[in-house]
Amino acid sequence: MNITSPNICSGRSVRSWYPSALLVLLSGFAACPPVVGETLYTVRQSYVVKDLPEGAGQVRGWFWMPEDRPEQRMLEFRVVEAPESLKVTRDPRYGRSWLYAEGTAGVGKPLRIVTEFKVLRSKVSGLADADRAGELTAEDRRAFAEELRLDEKHMEVTPTIQKIADDLAGNEKNPVVQARKFFDYVIAKSDHYSKFGSTPQGKCWGSASECLLGTGDCCTDQHALFIALCRARGIPCRLIYGSRLNPKNEGKDHDPGYRCWPKFYAPGLGWVPLDVSSGDTAGDRAAEWFGGLDDGRLEWAEGRDFDLEPRSSVRPDLVIRGWVEVDGKPHSAFDRVVNFSRDESPSMSRVGAVATERASTQVAVIGK
């Protein structure tokens, strides 16, 4: 089994080819982040589908898998256990890799996938430099039309959101300056649930409108509002999904859940990451999360309204951890377990040795 990963600094896999493709590629290289810290993670991740309904037939599952991104470098990836049907697919809309497998209920073991991988995660800071950013052009907006959609579900640019964006940004043309205004606004307007408890009180639909009403308290709600505000001003913005790896859980079997964050595009900088929810809980250090991300997270997926490959019977708006269908109907009962160890001072010789091994065999199947 082989995977060709996107260039580490490209910021994405190629999913569309425009006459302006050179602009897309160069903008990605411009976004290669300045690293201020690195952590090497060794991770074991498993998925198992459970609680199948009586009389169930076909079981299909699409699950998150890691790959090279601007702030992370995959050094090794192994499939430890999986059905014979396992394959790596790419969704055509976002170009991201997924683990896909299918089987028949009641025949053999439950649908179970276990992987192990090593990933070098970078802490980045200071990427939102307004002095280096240029104004967005018509060419930029043509190239990134997908990230400028005004009608994307739960991130619609309504008249209310358009007015808020215009009132905040005024005549400002610099995308970084505008995005910072939106970042500060969402923090002032909303509260992430973790400020008050351990579980969200909202619906967690990733809804800009819910966030405005004060009933959306998840990271997806806060970032949906930020994205809608950016798009209202013609600033391309996209949604990224990952997981935070809390040092307190090192060596423990657990499900780390998910954390999303957006990236907006600025000429001269490329795609700039930020985390409104982390900023919201950081007090007077909120600004560190505008153009910066910690190395205590992994990136998995991107976008909404997923066109999975092979095509799912139901097209999901959000995919958190994975998507399972039983006889063509969504099935939410599956477990995800992660266990990780970390090295906060990885030696370059060690990383280089693993990377050399990876170059010869990117993905190995070591068990069934």
Language-model regions, residue ranges each:
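N-terminal secretory signal peptides that target proteins for export/translocation
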Residues: 1-15
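Solvent-exposed, acidic/flexible segments
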Residues: 54, 154, 158, 172-179, ...
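Acidic low-complexity segments
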Residues: 10, 91, 112-193, 200-209, ...
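Hydrophobic/aromatic-rich core segments of domains that either
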Residues: 221-313
